Amino acid sequence: MIIRDAVHGDIEFNEDEVSIIDTPEVQRLRGIKQLGAASFVYPSATHTRFEHSLGTVFCTQKILNSLSSKYDLDPKLKKIIRISALLHDITHIPFGHTFEDERKLMPRHDKGNRF
């Protein structure tokens, strides 16, 4: 499946990735803004965690392509890395960084475990 992205152009996803993208857990990311409240100041800053996650897969593939030219990477490992990129924001909540950074209601998501 190919998904057309405004930043990266066409991004290709395999059947397993599409089945993950189609889950309610990933689809909920469509409703979470990547930049939280920034769109109140910058009205066009409205991209979502969903769009960001798709773009992360694109960037990850570019890295994998570069590494593959130097190293013999296991196809299964590349598949796991792409899926990890797709799911890296799966636990985000709306305004999550605001709760982490400004209100100190939650530990930072990138500093140790949240669970």
Language-model-derived ranges and their functions:
Residues L77-F115:
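Divalent metal-dependent catalytic cores for phosphoryl transfer on phosphate-bearing substrates
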Residues G9-I20, G36-S39, L73-L77:
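Short, mixed-charge, low-aromatic patches
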Residues V41-K79:
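Alpha-helical phosphate/pyrophosphate-handling elements in metalloenzyme active cores
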Residues M1-G31:
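Non-catalytic interface/linker regions that flank or bridge core catalytic/transmembrane domains
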Residues I20, R28-E51, E100:
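Active-site flanking loop/helix segments enriched in acidic
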Residues D10, F50-L54, N113:
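Generic detection of long, well-ordered alpha-helical segments
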Residues P24, L64-L67, P94:
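Short amphipathic alpha-helical segments enriched in hydrophobics
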